[in-house]
């Protein structure tokens, strides 16, 4: 399995996400892709990559055919799309749910099954958390190479987190917390997740408006 660096995996995650959520803007220009990489919503960590940072990694991914330049006709603006999975001659074939789970793990880092169910809503549908866990099990038992791993449960959390392995082995960063805070933290988890989802949806709408504005500017350039 190809091991990517953090910038490369952020680019791949953004291209997968935007292919589904904003198909009218896909493939993405360099400016739109940089904006997507640096979104404040649905990104952890939040980054401040330059166009040059993104382009350097894009050139590597294009040379390896993980990403392709889809510039057509007389267009002066390069546009990029991923070939990470489900290509005609590629070996990595993923279901819509599997691709959505990996996409969120690429963009947000380790997640619990409950968080994944919430945060994949714009990419696919899961009927329940058990369905997410089934997909994670499938990804973890891939015949070619495991694509996800289960981390140790964090103190105060009801669910263990899962991480992708496309950037190599994951060091489990379980945080030690004061036992007196565990109960309160556990009780507030569901409310925090609902608030986070609403904030994320508002921020994503703002980001998509910014990308649409950038697309119009690119077309008028």
From Swiss-Prot:
Name the InterPro entries for this protein.
Answer: DUF480 (IPR007432), WH-like_DNA-bd_sf (IPR036388), WH_DNA-bd_sf (IPR036390)
Q: Which Pfam families match?
A: DUF480
SUPFAM superfamilies recorded? Winged helix' DNA-binding domain
Query: HAMAP family from the entry?
Result: UPF0502
Q: Which family does it belong to?
A: Belongs to the UPF0502 family.
Q: Output this protein's name.
A: UPF0502 protein VSAL_II0605
Q: Tell me the lineage of the source organism.
A: Bacteria, Pseudomonadati, Pseudomonadota, Gammaproteobacteria, Vibrionales
């Amino acid at each position: 399995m190809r091991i990517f660096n953090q910038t490369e995996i952020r680019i791949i995650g953004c291209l997968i996400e935007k292919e589904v959520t904003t198909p009218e803007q896909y493939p993405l220009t360099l400016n739109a892709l940089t904006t997507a990489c640096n979104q404040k919503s649905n990104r952890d960590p939040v980054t401040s990559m330059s166009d040059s940072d993104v382009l350097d990694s894009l050139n590597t991914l294009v040379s390896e055919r993980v990403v392709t330049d889809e510039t057509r006709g007389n267009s002066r603006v390069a546009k990029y799309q991923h070939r990470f999975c489900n290509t005609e001659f590629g070996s990595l074939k993923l279901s819509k749910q599997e691709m959505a789970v990996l996409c969120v793990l690429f963009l947000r880092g380790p997640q619990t099954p409950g968080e994944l169910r919430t945060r994949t809503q714009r990419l696919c549908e899961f009927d329940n958390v058990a369905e997410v866990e089934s997909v994670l099990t499938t990804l973890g038992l891939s015949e070619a190479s495991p694509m996800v791993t289960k981390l140790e449960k964090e103190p105060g959390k009801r669910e263990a987190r899962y991480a992708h392995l496309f950037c190599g082995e994951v060091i489990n960063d379980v945080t030690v917390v004061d036992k007196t805070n565990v109960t309160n933290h556990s009780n507030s988890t569901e409310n925090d997740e609902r608030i986070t989802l609403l904030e994320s949806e508002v921020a994503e709408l703002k980001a998509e408006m910014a990308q649409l504005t950038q697309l119009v500017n690119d077309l008028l350039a």
